[in-house]
UniProtKB/Swiss-Prot annotation:
Function, as annotated: One of the primary rRNA binding proteins. Required for association of the 30S and 50S subunits to form the 70S ribosome, for tRNA binding and peptide bond formation. It has been suggested to have peptidyltransferase activity; this is somewhat controversial. Makes several contacts with the 16S rRNA in the 70S ribosome.
Keywords per UniProt: Ribonucleoprotein, Ribosomal protein, RNA-binding, rRNA-binding
Annotated segments matching region Disordered: 223-258
Organism whose genome encodes this protein: Geotalea uraniireducens (strain Rf4)
One GO term of the biological process aspect: cytoplasmic translation
Stated family: Belongs to the universal ribosomal protein uL2 family.
Domain of life: Bacteria
Matches recorded under PROSITE patterns: RIBOSOMAL_L2 (PS00467)
One Pfam short name: Ribosomal_L2_C
InterPro entries in alphabetical order: NA-bd_OB-fold, Rib_uL2_dom2, Ribosomal_uL2, Ribosomal_uL2_bac/org-type, Ribosomal_uL2_C, Ribosomal_uL2_CS, Ribosomal_uL2_dom3, Ribosomal_uL2_RNA-bd_dom
Gene3D superfamilies the record matches: 2.30.30.30, Nucleic acid-binding proteins, Ribosomal protein L2, domain 3
GO molecular function, one term: structural constituent of ribosome
Name listed for the protein in its UniProt record: Large ribosomal subunit protein uL2
Subunit structure, as described in the record: Part of the 50S ribosomal subunit. Forms a bridge to the 30S subunit in the 70S ribosome.
Amino acid sequence: MAIKSYKPTSAGRRHQTCSTFEEITTDKPEKSLLVKLKKTGGRNNFGRVTSRHIGGGHKQKYRIIDFRRDKRDIPAKVSSVEYDPYRSARIALLNYADGEKRYIIAPLDLKVGDTVISGPSADIKPGNALPIRSIPLGTIIHNIELKIGKGAQLARSAGTFAQLMAKEDKYAQVKLPSGEVRMVLLDCIATVGQVGNIDHENVSIGKAGRSRWLGKRPKVRGVAMNPVDHPHGGGEGRTSGGRHPVTPWGIPTKGYKTRTNKTSTRFIVKRRTK
Protein backbone atom coordinates (compact mmCIF):
# COMPACT_ATOMS: atom_id res chain seq x y z
CA MET A 1 0.00 0.00 0.00
CA ALA A 2 1.15 3.53 -0.76
CA ILE A 3 0.08 6.97 0.40
CA LYS A 4 -1.43 9.51 -2.01
CA SER A 5 -1.16 13.27 -1.43
CA TYR A 6 -3.16 16.05 -3.06
CA LYS A 7 -2.50 19.47 -4.55
CA PRO A 8 -3.48 22.21 -2.06
CA THR A 9 -6.70 23.22 -3.84
CA SER A 10 -8.20 24.13 -0.44
CA ALA A 11 -7.10 24.45 3.18
CA GLY A 12 -8.49 20.99 3.96
CA ARG A 13 -6.73 19.41 0.99
CA ARG A 14 -3.33 20.96 1.77
CA HIS A 15 -2.08 18.34 4.24
CA GLN A 16 -4.58 15.59 3.44
CA THR A 17 -3.26 12.16 2.48
CA CYS A 18 -5.08 8.99 1.57
CA SER A 19 -4.41 5.34 0.82
CA THR A 20 -4.03 4.43 -2.85
CA PHE A 21 -6.06 1.25 -2.20
CA GLU A 22 -3.91 -0.54 -4.80
CA GLU A 23 -4.04 -3.85 -2.92
CA ILE A 24 -7.85 -3.95 -3.03
CA THR A 25 -9.15 -6.22 -5.79
CA THR A 26 -12.94 -5.71 -5.59
CA ASP A 27 -15.46 -3.23 -4.23
CA LYS A 28 -18.30 -5.76 -4.02
CA PRO A 29 -18.27 -7.67 -0.69
CA GLU A 30 -19.60 -11.20 -0.22
CA LYS A 31 -23.31 -10.67 0.58
CA SER A 32 -23.65 -13.81 2.70
CA LEU A 33 -21.05 -12.41 5.13
CA LEU A 34 -22.64 -8.96 5.58
CA VAL A 35 -24.70 -7.89 8.60
CA LYS A 36 -26.57 -4.64 9.25
CA LEU A 37 -25.48 -2.86 12.43
CA LYS A 38 -27.53 -0.03 13.89
CA LYS A 39 -25.55 3.05 14.94
CA THR A 40 -25.71 3.84 18.65
CA GLY A 41 -24.34 7.39 18.67
CA GLY A 42 -22.37 6.34 21.75
CA ARG A 43 -25.60 5.79 23.73
CA ASN A 44 -26.68 2.75 25.77
CA ASN A 45 -30.17 1.25 26.11
CA PHE A 46 -31.18 4.11 28.46
CA GLY A 47 -30.23 6.66 25.81
CA ARG A 48 -27.36 7.97 27.93
CA VAL A 49 -23.93 8.74 26.48
CA THR A 50 -21.50 6.00 27.52
CA SER A 51 -18.85 6.72 24.85
CA ARG A 52 -18.22 10.36 24.04
CA HIS A 53 -17.30 11.78 20.63
CA ILE A 54 -19.22 9.13 18.66
CA GLY A 55 -22.03 9.83 16.20
CA GLY A 56 -22.95 10.24 12.55
CA GLY A 57 -20.67 8.80 9.91
CA HIS A 58 -21.33 7.00 6.66
CA LYS A 59 -23.73 4.07 6.65
CA GLN A 60 -21.80 0.78 6.82
CA LYS A 61 -22.37 -2.94 6.77
CA TYR A 62 -20.40 -5.18 9.11
CA ARG A 63 -18.30 -7.96 7.57
CA ILE A 64 -18.33 -11.19 9.59
CA ILE A 65 -14.65 -12.01 10.22
CA ASP A 66 -13.37 -15.48 11.12
CA PHE A 67 -11.24 -14.79 14.20
CA ARG A 68 -11.38 -18.40 15.43
CA ARG A 69 -9.82 -20.07 12.36
CA ASP A 70 -11.41 -23.35 13.48
CA LYS A 71 -11.76 -24.90 10.01
CA ARG A 72 -8.82 -27.28 10.40
CA ASP A 73 -6.75 -28.92 7.65
CA ILE A 74 -8.97 -27.68 4.79
CA PRO A 75 -7.06 -25.52 2.29
CA ALA A 76 -8.57 -22.20 1.23
CA LYS A 77 -7.72 -19.99 -1.74
CA VAL A 78 -7.69 -16.19 -1.45
CA SER A 79 -10.28 -14.91 -3.93
CA SER A 80 -10.15 -11.19 -3.10
CA VAL A 81 -8.63 -8.54 -0.82
CA GLU A 82 -11.21 -5.98 0.28
CA TYR A 83 -11.74 -2.77 2.22
CA ASP A 84 -13.48 -3.06 5.60
CA PRO A 85 -15.07 0.13 7.01
CA TYR A 86 -15.05 -1.30 10.56
CA ARG A 87 -11.26 -1.75 10.88
CA SER A 88 -7.95 -0.30 9.78
CA ALA A 89 -6.68 -3.57 8.28
CA ARG A 90 -7.76 -5.02 4.94
CA ILE A 91 -9.71 -8.28 4.83
CA ALA A 92 -9.25 -11.30 2.55
CA LEU A 93 -12.07 -13.51 1.27
CA LEU A 94 -11.21 -17.22 1.47
CA ASN A 95 -12.84 -19.89 -0.69
CA TYR A 96 -12.46 -23.24 1.11
CA ALA A 97 -12.16 -26.52 -0.77
CA ASP A 98 -15.56 -27.63 0.60
CA GLY A 99 -17.27 -24.52 -0.81
CA GLU A 100 -17.52 -22.39 2.34
CA LYS A 101 -16.48 -18.72 2.24
CA ARG A 102 -14.97 -16.77 5.14
CA TYR A 103 -13.28 -13.43 5.71
CA ILE A 104 -9.97 -13.13 7.58
CA ILE A 105 -7.72 -10.19 8.45
CA ALA A 106 -5.37 -9.83 5.47
CA PRO A 107 -1.70 -10.26 6.50
CA LEU A 108 1.13 -8.45 4.76
CA ASP A 109 1.98 -9.80 1.27
CA LEU A 110 -1.12 -12.03 1.04
CA LYS A 111 -2.31 -11.95 -2.58
CA VAL A 112 -5.21 -13.28 -4.63
CA GLY A 113 -4.54 -16.90 -5.58
CA ASP A 114 -2.52 -17.72 -2.45
CA THR A 115 -3.51 -20.77 -0.42
CA VAL A 116 -3.85 -20.67 3.37
CA ILE A 117 -4.71 -23.37 5.88
CA SER A 118 -5.18 -23.68 9.63
CA GLY A 119 -4.15 -26.57 11.84
CA PRO A 120 -1.20 -27.81 13.91
CA SER A 121 0.60 -29.22 10.85
CA ALA A 122 0.30 -26.07 8.69
CA ASP A 123 3.42 -24.50 7.17
CA ILE A 124 4.94 -21.41 8.79
CA LYS A 125 3.89 -18.86 6.17
CA PRO A 126 1.78 -15.66 6.31
CA GLY A 127 -1.94 -16.32 6.67
CA ASN A 128 -1.67 -19.82 8.12
CA ALA A 129 -3.14 -20.29 11.61
CA LEU A 130 -1.61 -22.71 14.12
CA PRO A 131 -1.64 -23.42 17.86
CA ILE A 132 1.20 -21.44 19.45
CA ARG A 133 2.92 -24.69 20.53
CA SER A 134 3.45 -25.48 16.79
CA ILE A 135 5.03 -22.10 15.98
CA PRO A 136 8.86 -21.70 16.23
CA LEU A 137 10.36 -19.16 18.64
CA GLY A 138 11.03 -15.73 17.16
CA THR A 139 8.19 -15.99 14.64
CA ILE A 140 6.18 -12.84 13.84
CA ILE A 141 2.49 -13.50 14.57
CA HIS A 142 -0.85 -11.67 14.79
CA ASN A 143 -4.52 -12.45 15.55
CA ILE A 144 -3.69 -14.11 18.88
CA GLU A 145 -6.25 -15.79 21.11
CA LEU A 146 -6.27 -15.19 24.88
CA LYS A 147 -8.76 -17.97 25.63
CA ILE A 148 -8.84 -21.27 23.75
CA GLY A 149 -11.60 -21.22 21.14
CA LYS A 150 -12.77 -17.67 21.90
CA GLY A 151 -11.20 -16.13 18.82
CA ALA A 152 -8.34 -13.71 18.23
CA GLN A 153 -8.15 -10.63 20.46
CA LEU A 154 -4.56 -9.37 20.19
CA ALA A 155 -2.59 -7.71 17.33
CA ARG A 156 -5.47 -7.21 14.88
CA SER A 157 -5.11 -3.62 13.65
CA ALA A 158 -3.23 -2.45 10.56
CA GLY A 159 0.54 -3.02 10.59
CA THR A 160 0.65 -4.65 14.03
CA PHE A 161 2.44 -7.85 14.98
CA ALA A 162 3.61 -9.75 18.04
CA GLN A 163 6.67 -11.95 18.50
CA LEU A 164 6.89 -15.36 20.13
CA MET A 165 9.63 -15.07 22.76
CA ALA A 166 9.61 -18.28 24.85
CA LYS A 167 7.70 -21.44 25.78
CA GLU A 168 7.51 -22.79 29.31
CA ASP A 169 5.20 -25.47 30.72
CA LYS A 170 1.76 -24.81 29.22
CA TYR A 171 2.37 -21.11 28.48
CA ALA A 172 4.19 -19.13 25.82
CA GLN A 173 5.61 -15.64 26.31
CA VAL A 174 4.52 -13.25 23.57
CA LYS A 175 5.81 -9.70 23.05
CA LEU A 176 2.83 -7.54 22.08
CA PRO A 177 2.80 -4.36 19.93
CA SER A 178 2.72 -2.21 23.09
CA GLY A 179 5.99 -3.77 24.30
CA GLU A 180 4.20 -5.80 26.97
CA VAL A 181 5.36 -9.40 27.37
CA ARG A 182 2.44 -11.63 28.26
CA MET A 183 1.85 -15.31 28.92
CA VAL A 184 -0.57 -17.03 26.53
CA LEU A 185 -1.66 -20.67 26.60
CA LEU A 186 0.21 -22.86 24.10
CA ASP A 187 -3.07 -24.23 22.72
CA CYS A 188 -4.33 -20.78 21.72
CA ILE A 189 -4.42 -20.12 17.97
CA ALA A 190 -2.31 -17.42 16.29
CA THR A 191 -1.80 -16.46 12.65
CA VAL A 192 1.67 -16.24 11.11
CA GLY A 193 2.83 -12.89 9.73
CA GLN A 194 2.20 -9.18 10.21
CA VAL A 195 -1.15 -7.49 9.62
CA GLY A 196 -1.19 -5.69 6.26
CA ASN A 197 -1.92 -2.03 5.38
CA ILE A 198 1.23 -0.94 7.23
CA ASP A 199 1.04 2.66 5.93
CA HIS A 200 -2.25 3.29 7.71
CA GLU A 201 -0.45 5.20 10.49
CA ASN A 202 0.88 7.70 7.92
CA VAL A 203 -2.55 8.79 6.65
CA SER A 204 -3.38 12.41 7.51
CA ILE A 205 -7.11 13.07 7.91
CA GLY A 206 -6.62 16.67 6.69
CA LYS A 207 -9.99 18.17 7.60
CA ALA A 208 -12.72 17.94 10.22
CA GLY A 209 -15.35 16.67 7.78
CA ARG A 210 -13.38 13.53 7.02
CA SER A 211 -13.40 12.63 10.72
CA ARG A 212 -17.18 13.10 10.68
CA TRP A 213 -17.45 10.64 7.77
CA LEU A 214 -15.75 8.13 10.08
CA GLY A 215 -18.31 8.73 12.84
CA LYS A 216 -16.03 10.82 15.06
CA ARG A 217 -17.50 13.93 16.72
CA PRO A 218 -15.48 16.91 18.00
CA LYS A 219 -13.63 16.69 21.32
CA VAL A 220 -14.34 19.88 23.27
CA ARG A 221 -11.61 20.98 25.72
CA GLY A 222 -12.58 21.12 29.37
CA VAL A 223 -11.21 24.68 29.76
CA ALA A 224 -13.62 25.83 27.03
CA MET A 225 -16.66 24.59 29.01
CA ASN A 226 -18.71 26.03 31.88
CA PRO A 227 -18.08 24.91 35.49
CA VAL A 228 -21.26 22.79 35.41
CA ASP A 229 -19.84 20.73 32.54
CA HIS A 230 -16.22 20.14 33.53
CA PRO A 231 -13.84 20.63 36.50
CA HIS A 232 -11.64 22.84 34.26
CA GLY A 233 -14.56 25.01 33.15
CA GLY A 234 -15.37 28.65 33.93
CA GLY A 235 -13.14 31.50 35.02
CA GLU A 236 -12.88 35.08 33.79
CA GLY A 237 -11.19 35.17 30.40
CA ARG A 238 -8.96 32.36 29.23
CA THR A 239 -7.66 30.20 32.07
CA SER A 240 -5.49 27.11 32.38
CA GLY A 241 -8.11 25.18 34.36
CA GLY A 242 -6.55 26.00 37.71
CA ARG A 243 -5.79 22.43 38.78
CA HIS A 244 -3.94 19.35 37.66
CA PRO A 245 -5.58 17.85 34.55
CA VAL A 246 -8.61 15.68 35.29
CA THR A 247 -11.36 13.94 33.34
CA PRO A 248 -14.93 15.36 33.33
CA TRP A 249 -15.56 13.11 36.37
CA GLY A 250 -12.60 14.43 38.39
CA ILE A 251 -10.21 11.50 37.88
CA PRO A 252 -6.57 12.58 37.30
CA THR A 253 -5.39 12.14 33.72
CA LYS A 254 -2.14 12.45 31.74
CA GLY A 255 -0.21 9.53 33.18
CA TYR A 256 -2.40 8.56 36.12
CA LYS A 257 -2.85 4.77 36.17
CA THR A 258 -6.47 3.65 36.40
CA ARG A 259 -6.02 -0.09 35.75
CA THR A 260 -7.30 -2.14 38.69
CA ASN A 261 -5.55 -5.27 39.92
CA LYS A 262 -7.24 -8.34 38.52
CA THR A 263 -6.62 -12.04 38.13
CA SER A 264 -5.13 -11.64 34.66
CA THR A 265 -2.35 -9.39 36.03
CA ARG A 266 -0.32 -12.51 36.83
CA PHE A 267 -0.07 -13.28 33.10
CA ILE A 268 1.85 -10.05 32.46
CA VAL A 269 5.58 -10.84 32.56
CA LYS A 270 6.72 -7.31 31.65
CA ARG A 271 4.67 -4.12 31.60
CA ARG A 272 4.26 -2.21 28.36
CA THR A 273 6.97 0.29 27.41
CA LYS A 274 6.19 3.93 26.71
